[in-house]
UniProtKB/Swiss-Prot annotation:
Domain notes: The mature protein is largely unstructured in the absence of a cognate ligand.
One GO MF term: hormone activity
Keywords, comma-separated and alphabetical: Amidation, Amyloid, Cleavage on pair of basic residues, Disulfide bond, Hormone, Secreted, Signal
Protein name: Islet amyloid polypeptide
Organism of this sequence: Bos taurus
Function recorded in the entry: Amylin/IAPP is a glucoregulatory peptide hormone that plays an important role in the regulation of energy homeostasis. Selectively inhibits insulin-stimulated glucose utilization and glycogen deposition in muscle, while not affecting adipocyte glucose metabolism. IAPP function is mediated by the CALCR-RAMPs (AMYRs) receptor complexes. Amylin can also bind CALCR receptor in the absence of RAMPs, although it is more selective for AMYRs.
One annotated GO biological process: amylin receptor signaling pathway
Length: 91
C-alpha cells in the first residue's frame, strides 16, 4: 500500500512546487523569460532541488562518503591497454 502512495505524493509535490514557482509577479523587463521545461526529467530535477536539504544559495551540500578507488577495486592497466580503441573517435 505504501508503494502506491509514493507516486501520488510525488505528483502532489510537483503540482505544489509548480504553483509556488508560478505565483510571482509577471516581469516587466524587455528580456525574454526563460521557457519552463515540462518534461519528466525537468520535473524530477525541480522536485529534487526543492527537497534538497540545503540552507545556502550555492547549491546542495552533500555529506562526504568513504567511497574511494578501493571500494570497487582498481582497474588493471593491462586490461585497459588491451582494449581496442573506440571506432567513432577520429584518430
Amino acid at each position: 500500500m505504501g508503494i502506491l502512495k509514493l507516486p501520488v505524493v510525488l505528483i502532489v509535490l510537483c503540482v505544489a512546487l509548480n504553483h509556488l514557482e508560478g505565483g510571482g509577479k509577471p516581469t516587466e523587463s524587455h528580456q525574454m523569460e526563460k521557457r519552463k521545461c515540462g518534461t519528466a526529467t525537468c520535473e524530477t530535477q525541480r522536485l529534487a532541488n526543492f527537497l534538497a536539504p540545503s540552507s545556502n544559495k550555492l547549491g546542495a551540500i552533500f555529506s562526504p562518503t568513504k567511497m574511494g578507488s578501493n571500494t570497487y577495486g582498481k582497474r588493471k592497466k593491462v586490461e585497459i591497454l588491451k582494449r581496442e580503441p573506440l571506432s567513432y573517435l577520429p584518430i
